[in-house]
Every structure is written in structure tokens, then in C-alpha cells.
UniProtKB/Swiss-Prot annotation:
Annotated catalytic residues: 22
Site (Discriminates between blocked and unblocked aminoacyl-tRNA): 12
Binding residues annotated for tRNA, in chain numbering: 17, 68, 70, 116
Subunit structure: Monomer.
Keyword Hydrolase appears in the UniProt entry: yes
EC number: 3.1.1.29
GO molecular function: peptidyl-tRNA hydrolase activity; tRNA binding
Gene it is expressed from: pth
Primary localization: cytoplasm
Matches recorded under InterPro entries: Pept_tRNA_hydro (IPR001328), Pept_tRNA_hydro_CS (IPR018171), Pept_tRNA_hydro_sf (IPR036416)
EC category: hydrolase
Protein's UniProt name: Peptidyl-tRNA hydrolase
Matching Pfam families: Pept_tRNA_hydro
Annotated positions for site Stabilizes the basic form of H active site to accept a proton: 95
Source organism per UniProt: Mycobacterium ulcerans (strain Agy99)
Species lineage: Bacteria, Bacillati, Actinomycetota, Actinomycetes, Mycobacteriales
Length: 191
């Protein structure tokens, strides 16, 4: 039997951050957990919240680090080790400044694009070679600091679109689990 995939949604814990752009990874992870009909429980060794189940007929561990975004790697790496998941079988779901709002892209490896959560995961794993579900939030308007922008709630025009974007990102994640990166990219990037 194949080892599980580790699917991690990135975000910040706490109600103050729940509806911010930086928490799209958590929002999608919550949606995937609901699709599994499961509730997150704290994994004692890593401190992250986890759900185990099957997505697209594949065993998965779905996780949300309970530490702040910039420290995500310190909970993701122990989870990967505990479940014997190599970096190539890790899928990280995250917000992406370098994509237009609502655009979803799948990627393997590469840079972090200034995303400190990705940087933390890559540093803790010792490699950038893991899969990513990138959810576009767009660039901040004018001269607004990107660090401030990602920690703000979605704007009034964006807010109604967020549930649909999360559904699409969850669908993209399930497709990635089911068919692998290249076939999933071919379909998702055509949406």
C-alpha cells in the first residue's frame, strides 16, 4: 500500500486571522476536511491539527499548522517524518501574491516568492521540491506593504467570490491527488 500524501493548508491561527488573505490555505483545508466528513484533531508529536482519510481513493493526511505562518515548517517537517511522507509527496496549499485574485495554479518546487510560510517549510524539509496549490490574491494596490495586505480581510468586492475560489482550490487539490501534477496542471490551468 502506498504511503499517504501530506496535504497542508497554510495560515495563521486565531479568530483575528480567520478571514484574511493569508488564511486561504486554512480555508481550503477546512473545506477538504468537511468533504471527508472529519474534524481536525491535534497531532501530539507535531502540534498541528490533522485529519486522516481518503481523497480520490488515495490515503491522505490533511494538516493545518497551529503555529504562525512564518514558523509552519516546524510543524510540517515532524508530520512528514511521522507519516513517512517524502517532500515530493507533500502538497502545500497557500495564498499567492504573484497570481491575480482567484487564479489557481499548481507547481512543483521553485522559489517561495517572498512567502514566509513556504520559506519555513522549505527550510525545515531541507528542500523546495514539494507540490503547491497556489491561490491568487493579487498584488496590493498602490504602495501598500504586501505584509500588511496579506493580513487584511478580503475587500467587499472580493468577499463574495472567496467561497467559490476555495471550492475550486479544493477541487484542484483533489485532482492533483487523483491524477498527479502534470495531468492536473493541464486541466486546472485551463480553468
Amino acid at each position: 500500500m502506498a504511503e499517504p500524501l501530506l496535504v497542508v493548508g497554510l495560515g495563521n491561527p486565531g479568530e483575528n486571522y480567520a478571514r484574511t488573505r493569508h488564511n486561504l490555505g486554512f480555508m481550503v483545508a477546512d473545506l477538504l476536511a468537511a468533504r471527508l466528513g472529519a474534524k481536525f484533531k491535534v497531532h501530539k508529536r507535531s502540534g498541528a491539527e490533522v485529519v486522516t482519510g481518503r481523497l480520490a481513493q488515495r490515503s491522505v493526511v490533511l494538516a493545518k499548522p497551529r503555529c504562525y505562518m512564518n514558523e509552519s515548517g516546524r510543524q510540517v517537517a515532524p508530520l512528514a517524518k511521522f507519516y513517512s511522507v517524502p517532500p515530493a509527496d507533500l502538497i502545500v496549499i497557500h495564498d499567492e501574491l504573484d497570481l491575480d485574485f482567484g487564479r489557481i495554479r499548481l507547481k512543483f518546487g521553485g522559489g517561495e516568492g517572498g512567502h514566509n510560510g513556504l520559506r519555513s517549510v522549505a527550510a525545515a524539509l531541507g528542500t523546495k521540491n514539494f507540490q503547491r496549490v497556489r491561490i491568487g490574491i493579487g498584488r496590493p494596490p498602490g504602495r501598500k506593504d504586501p505584509a500588511t495586505f496579506v493580513l487584511e480581510n478580503f475587500s467587499s468586492p472580493e468577499r463574495p467570490e472567496v467561497p467559490t475560489i476555495c471550492e475550486q482550490a479544493a477541487d484542484a487539490t483533489e485532482l492533483l491527488v487523483e491524477v498527479g501534477l502534470e495531468p492536473a496542471q493541464n486541466r486546472v490551468h485551463a480553468w
